[in-house]
């Protein structure tokens, strides 16, 4: 047995499923998950000593690559002064100033510890601000594991085939209305059914938890218009897309202004951080200035703030997003060319530093129903054969892939060459 296999066997006796987040268990592809010893740049190194070109990037945060020296040094320096104070720090103020500078729609920001905390808190704030209970989300979109959001969810819930989680009371779920991504008619129908009851729409501007589904040109502006028409707030969940699709997020890339924005992943540079923010009048409703309660013992943790501040300063440097997009375009086109040459039907969606691979005869993949028709069994074989080639992709047909600026053109070429060999075996 490999060391990963031994560790997985031991972990399953101690941790549910042997992992601390379900998708890591390889449930979506079968086999034994890799146990990682270290990472550097574009590469992961497992406990058995094998190196992999990494396109998971810790599920998105590692836009600069692993173990970036600026982030590592910031963490070391901050840790030398203490790990947590439970009191405000100067770095919290600097971090808030940087985030609101980079994302102009955020007049104010509140730091939390995860993307789930960010979305959960933003929805509570929207409900408190509007005095309404119902929310709209989209089928196949994942916004964390808060009860109200585990209704027809994507990500690990979709991988496990459990889009409606047990443990969520029907009385909670009834306030969550689910519409079809990229379908404005379904959203209007929900508003017309409940014209005075919907507090907000929450949406991934690029749906990254049913693989990678970009919005149709009219979709996000249409959501903004519907929210304005019916007096609801628009929450854009940029936990995955923030600072990755563009410096100011997918909202800037697609030209839509939300009332509230949720951030995570990249904002922590690899540390556990989330944030939500937006219009001042909405944020003023948050405790302690307003009645909507939200709190956290470790929110604004000095180590996490230092890591995030260092990361965002690097991400904001000229050329970062141009490089990220060009590398992703090269990979996407190379995979398409390799698949075509092998006679394998394939769709690759990509935007900014995100991409999605779909084994399908369809010409496009634009919503949840398109995604679930794709050939999952072929993806499983593709995943394991690529892993044997030293390429680590997301271990689920329903998860996006992530590029970093640490990937080299040689890494991209090697990945495409590996895919050519694998397609020949499929």
UniProtKB/Swiss-Prot annotation:
HAMAP family: HemL_aminotrans_3. GO terms for cellular component: cytoplasm. It comes from Klebsiella pneumoniae subsp. pneumoniae (strain ATCC 700721 / MGH 78578). Keywords: Cytoplasm, Isomerase, Porphyrin biosynthesis, Pyridoxal phosphate. The keyword Secreted does not apply. It is an enzyme of class 5 (isomerase). CDD domains: OAT_like. It catalyses: (S)-4-amino-5-oxopentanoate = 5-aminolevulinate. Its cofactor is pyridoxal 5'-phosphate. The keyword Cytoplasm applies. GO terms for biological process: protoporphyrinogen IX biosynthetic process. Belongs to the class-III pyridoxal-phosphate-dependent aminotransferase family. HemL subfamily. One of its GO terms (molecular function) is transaminase activity. Homodimer. Pathway: Porphyrin-containing compound metabolism; protoporphyrin-IX biosynthesis; 5-aminolevulinate from L-glutamyl-tRNA(Glu): step 2/2. It comes from the Bacteria. The modification N6-(pyridoxal phosphate)lysine is found at residue 265. Its EC number is 5.4.3.8. It is found in: Cytoplasm. Pfam families: Aminotran_3. The lineage of its organism: Bacteria, Pseudomonadati, Pseudomonadota, Gammaproteobacteria, Enterobacterales. Its main location: cytoplasm. This is Glutamate-1-semialdehyde 2,1-aminomutase. SUPFAM superfamilies: PLP-dependent transferases. InterPro entries: 4pyrrol_synth_GluAld_NH2Trfase, Aminotrans_3, Aminotrans_3_PPA_site, PyrdxlP-dep_Trfase, PyrdxlP-dep_Trfase_major, PyrdxlP-dep_Trfase_small.
């Amino acid at each position: 047995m490999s060391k990963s296999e031994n560790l997985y066997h031991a972990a399953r006796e101690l941790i549910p499923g042997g992992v601390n987040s379900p998708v890591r268990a390889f449930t979506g592809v079968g086999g034994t998950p890799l146990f990682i010893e270290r990472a550097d740049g574009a590469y992961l190194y497992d406990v058995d000593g094998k190196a992999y070109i990494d396109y998971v990037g810790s599920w998105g945060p590692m836009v600069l690559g692993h173990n970036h020296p600026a982030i590592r040094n910031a963490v070391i320096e901050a840790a030398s002064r203490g790990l947590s104070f439970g009191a405000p720090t100067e770095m919290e103020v600097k971090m808030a100033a940087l985030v609101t500078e980079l994302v102009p729609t955020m007049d104010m920001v509140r730091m939390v510890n995860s993307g789930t905390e960010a979305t959960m808190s933003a929805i509570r704030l929207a409900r408190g601000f509007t005095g309404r209970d119902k929310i709209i989300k989209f089928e196949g979109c994942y916004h964390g594991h808060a009860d109200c959001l585990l209704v027809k969810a994507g990500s690990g819930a979709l991988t496990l085939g459990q889009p409606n989680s047990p443990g969520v009371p029907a009385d909670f779920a009834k306030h969550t209305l689910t519409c079809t991504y990229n379908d404005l008619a379904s959203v209007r129908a929900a508003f017309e059914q409940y014209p005075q009851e919907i507090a907000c729409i929450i949406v991934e501007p690029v749906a990254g938890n049913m693989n990678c589904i970009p919005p149709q040109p009219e979709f996000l502006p249409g959501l903004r218009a519907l929210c304005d028409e019916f007096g609801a707030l628009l929450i854009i969940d940029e936990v995955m897309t923030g600072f990755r699709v563009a410096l100011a997020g997918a909202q800037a890339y697609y030209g839509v202004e939300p009332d509230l924005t949720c951030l995570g992943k990249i904002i922590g540079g690899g540390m556990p951080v989330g944030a939500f923010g937006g219009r001042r009048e909405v944020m003023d409703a948050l405790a302690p200035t307003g009645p909507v309660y939200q709190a956290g013992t470790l929110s604004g943790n000095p180590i996490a703030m230092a890591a995030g501040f260092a990361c965002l300063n690097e991400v904001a440097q000229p050329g970062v997003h141009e490089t990220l997009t060009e590398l992703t375009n090269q990979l996407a086109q190379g995979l398409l060319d390799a698949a075509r040459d092998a006679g394998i039907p394939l769709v690759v969606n990509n935007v900014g530093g995100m991409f999605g691979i779909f084994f399908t005869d369809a010409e496009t993949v634009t919503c949840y129903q398109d995604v679930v028709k794709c050939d999952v069994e072929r993806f499983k074989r593709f995943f394991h054969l690529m892993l044997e080639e030293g390429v680590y992709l997301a271990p689920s047909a329903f998860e996006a892939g992530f590029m970093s600026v640490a990937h080299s053109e040689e890494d991209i070429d090697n990945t495409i060459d590996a895919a050519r060999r694998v397609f020949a075996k499929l």
